[in-house]
């Protein structure tokens, strides 16, 4: 069995878990956002909401800059419209997610050039942001039972729901195999030393959750997005249940 963390910025193909790639799902087609054309409003918005651009860090690879851009953009959008962010976070795959993202993403959070992403990527970036914001200091843990991702997927066709559910069940397995490492990866900054260590540490947990004899290619963003989603859903449900007692 071989596990490879691929240095590919925006690829979402993992053969052993999800046979259907994002590229074959028309509802997850790439969206491109350009800066808002109203300069005065953009400047006002930028100072208030910290609109972002591609990071100009010579130490970061272009691939890492792309990963960081999605999370930075998601952070700005989350801060400016928490209600919209929650609608994206809670949307199931397919058309519901695309509609939520199209209504939510806007050029007021992007300063220069353009940013392109799939709806599933922006949702993943939002899960990173939301989990960090609420649970950076400590993971609340996991519910005794896995999340029902079939219910979240809803009534979309099997070609979409199968890969969606399989990937998140894979994430559940990784998180239960080593919660501390999953948490460390979810809260680490893009391309930081902490993230590099976390990716190294998480490899053994990934291996536990892949069938023997299979070779799997996992992108860094896919692992980070999936673990952040799994941890966030468990953490918020745990927090809600404790609040009701």
Write out the residue ranges for each language-model feature.
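A cross-kingdom marker for long, charged
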Residues: 196-245
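N-terminal Sec/ER secretory leader and immediately downstream segment
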Residues: 19-128
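Eukaryotic terminal intrinsically disordered regions
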Residues: 22-35, 39, 162-163, 167, ...
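Extended amphipathic alpha-helical interaction segments
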Residues: 121-190
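Short, low-complexity cationic-aromatic patches
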Residues: 65-71, 78, 161-168, 175, ...
């Amino acid at each position: 069995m071989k596990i490879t963390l691929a240095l590919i910025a925006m690829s979402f193909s993992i053969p052993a878990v999800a046979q259907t790639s994002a590229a074959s799902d028309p509802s997850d087609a790439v969206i491109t956002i350009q800066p808002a054309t109203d300069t005065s409003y953009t400047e006002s918005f930028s100072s208030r909401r910290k609109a972002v651009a591609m990071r100009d860090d010579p130490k970061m690879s272009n691939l890492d800059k792309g990963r960081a851009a999605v999370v930075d953009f998601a952070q700005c959008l989350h801060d400016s419209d928490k209600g919209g962010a929650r609608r994206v976070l809670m949307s199931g795959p397919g058309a519901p997610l695309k509609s939520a993202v199209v209504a939510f993403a806007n050029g007021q959070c992007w300063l220069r050039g353009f940013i392109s992403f799939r709806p599933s990527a922006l949702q993943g970036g939002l899960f990173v942001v939301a989990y960090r914001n609420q649970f950076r200091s400590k993971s609340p843990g996991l519910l005794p039972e896995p999340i029902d991702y079939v219910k979240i997927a809803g009534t979309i066709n099997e070609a979409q729901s199968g890969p969606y559910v399989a990937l998140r069940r894979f994430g559940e397995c990784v998180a239960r195999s080593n919660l501390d490492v999953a948490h460390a990866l979810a809260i680490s900054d893009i391309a930081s030393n902490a993230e590099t260590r976390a990716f190294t540490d998480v490899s053994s947990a990934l291996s536990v959750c892949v069938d023997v004899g299979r070779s799997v290619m996992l992108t860094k963003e896919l692992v980070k997005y999936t673990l952040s989603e799994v941890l966030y859903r468990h953490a918020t449900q745990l927090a809600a249940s404790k609040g009701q007692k």
